[in-house]
Amino acid sequence: MSGLGIMVLTLLLLVSMATSHQDGRGKQATQRDAINVRRRRSITRTEACYEYCKEQNKTCCGISNGRPICVGGCIR
């Protein structure tokens, strides 16, 4: 095989490796965004629980079946 053929094959290999590496970054960014959305939702639920229980002069001890658990004091 000529030197030019080897150079072309090497170039194709490098391009395919670079492309697959960039695809991996895109997947990581998508996963990171999904995790951030989940965290924001849980923070919102927790804040809503605290506000709901504060109106009843109780403490929010968590959420069960989508409903806040409000008691005088949490046991952990």
Swiss-Prot record:
Subcellular location: Secreted
Family recorded in the similarity comment: Belongs to the conotoxin O3 superfamily.
An example molecular function term from Gene Ontology annotations: toxin activity
GO CC terms in record: extracellular region
Residues excised as propeptide: 21-45
Pfam families: Conotoxin
The protein, known as: Conotoxin VnMSGL-0112
Sorted UniProt keywords: Disulfide bond, Knottin, Neurotoxin, Secreted, Signal, Toxin
InterPro entries noted in UniProt: Conotoxin (IPR004214)
Organismal lineage: Eukaryota, Metazoa, Spiralia, Lophotrochozoa, Mollusca
UniProt keyword Glycoprotein present: no
Expression sites (tissue/organ): Expressed by the venom duct.
Residue pairs linked by disulfide bridges in the UniProt entry: 49-61, 53-70, 60-74
Signal sequence annotation: 1-20
